[in-house]
Amino acid sequence: MTVAVGRPQSQRGAFDVLDDWLKRDRFVFVGWSGILLFPCAFLSIGGWLTGTTFVTSWYTHGLASSYLEGCNFLTVAISSPAYSMGHSLLFLWGPEAQWDFARWCQIGGLWSFTALHGAFALIGFCLRQIEIARLVGIRPYNAIAFTGPIAVFVSVFLMYPLGQSSWFFAPSFGVAGIFRFILFLQGFHNWTLNPFHMMGVAGILGGALLCAIHGATVENTLFQDGEAANTFRAFEPTQSEETYSMVTANRFWSQIFGIAFSNKRWLHFFMLFVPVTGLWMSSIGIVGLAFNLRAYDFVSQELRAADDPEFETFYTKNILLNEGIRAWMSPADQPHQNFMFPEEVLPRGNAL
């Protein structure tokens, strides 16, 4: 008698079928992260394009902000909601808009729509890098690096206005709108004298410097392994040998500075660490601003400058500039407060 022993075929459930379809090899990988990434990215980008093309900011900021009103690419924006909306999520079906799309746009609903979907899209993109790294079998350092931009976006567009009294104080989605927000941070928070801003600048500019030095050093030490006019065509993605000389690069920088990286892994980790740490530090600083934490205050210099007209430092000059920013920006930037400053109390520069 013959006995056939076999493994019973397991029943494939709907989850397994969906998992196979999401992870199928295609031109654009979808994956589980794509369920979050693609809809949110589509809606946030679509909301921004719609708002900058058609929607005015007259009802929220008293400004023109769309192509339809004559703005250009640098001046269009989706402005933050009206101050009276507080921290409402401004759903289209909520009590503020009540399914009225025109009213929803007027009170700033597109801003919250774009901000929230944009935040989830960035998180989805980070998860996408983790998912693909796991499938390919590599480390998830790309995703770790991308947490820096996510932290900046969430802290600036969500955490800061949450710490303030309304979404109104968030930056608008536009080039000139971001510039206005930067001036606001300086005038009302003295942001450039905040140590977390200093660490952020050091990280970003330091990362740019490291990137430039690394790229130039690699180009300088390429092996002459081709007969073409340039060395780019001599490289093959699948080649087993090195394409540049680490030993030569180490000797070069040892002569320049006296010290140099001798370990490629430490070098590239350092290039990852510097800019990402800078982004995270600036994000922490923005969260501090949300709760109105102050930057460095050199009160002794302010007191001496108040008593001695001949004593002035760059710090005291910057404090006066901040006062000027507040005085000039407040009436236009916060129309709901109905500020009215007499001409004689507004700061006047020598050139005015």
Swiss-Prot record:
GO biological process, any: photosynthetic electron transport in photosystem II
Signal sequence coordinates: none
Main localization of the protein described in the UniProt heading: membrane
UniProt remark on cofactor binding: The D1/D2 heterodimer binds P680, chlorophylls that are the primary electron donor of PSII, and subsequent electron acceptors. It shares a non-heme iron and each subunit binds pheophytin, quinone, additional chlorophylls, carotenoids and lipids. There is also a Cl(-1) ion associated with D1 and D2, which is required for oxygen evolution. The PSII complex binds additional chlorophylls, carotenoids and specific lipids.
Catalytic reaction equation(s): 2 a plastoquinone + 4 hnu + 2 H2O = 2 a plastoquinol + O2
EC nos: 1.10.3.9
Catalytic class of the enzyme: oxidoreductase
Membrane topology: Multi-pass membrane protein
Entry keyword Metal-binding: yes
One Pfam family in the UniProt entry: Photo_RC
Binding site for chlorophyll a ChlzD2: 117
Location(s), subcellular: Cellular thylakoid membrane
Entry keywords, A to Z: Chlorophyll, Chromophore, Electron transport, Iron, Magnesium, Membrane, Metal-binding, Oxidoreductase, Photosynthesis, Photosystem II, Thylakoid, Transmembrane, Transmembrane helix, Transport
One CC-aspect GO term: plasma membrane-derived thylakoid membrane
Residues binding Fe cation: 214, 268
Segments crossing the lipid bilayer: 40-60, 124-140, 152-165, 207-227, 278-294
Binding site for chlorophyll a PD2: 197
Alphabetical list of Gene3D superfamilies matching this protein: Photosystem II protein D1-like
Chain sites annotated for binding a plastoquinone: 214, 261
NCBIfam families: psbD (TIGR01152)
Subunit structure: PSII is composed of 1 copy each of membrane proteins PsbA, PsbB, PsbC, PsbD, PsbE, PsbF, PsbH, PsbI, PsbJ, PsbK, PsbL, PsbM, PsbT, PsbX, PsbY, PsbZ, Psb30/Ycf12, peripheral proteins PsbO, CyanoQ (PsbQ), PsbU, PsbV and a large number of cofactors. It forms dimeric complexes.
Additional remarks: 2 of the reaction center chlorophylls (ChlD1 and ChlD2) are entirely coordinated by water.
Family (UniProt): Belongs to the reaction center PufL/M/PsbA/D family.
UniProt-recorded name of the protein: Photosystem II D2 protein
Organism: Trichodesmium erythraeum (strain IMS101)
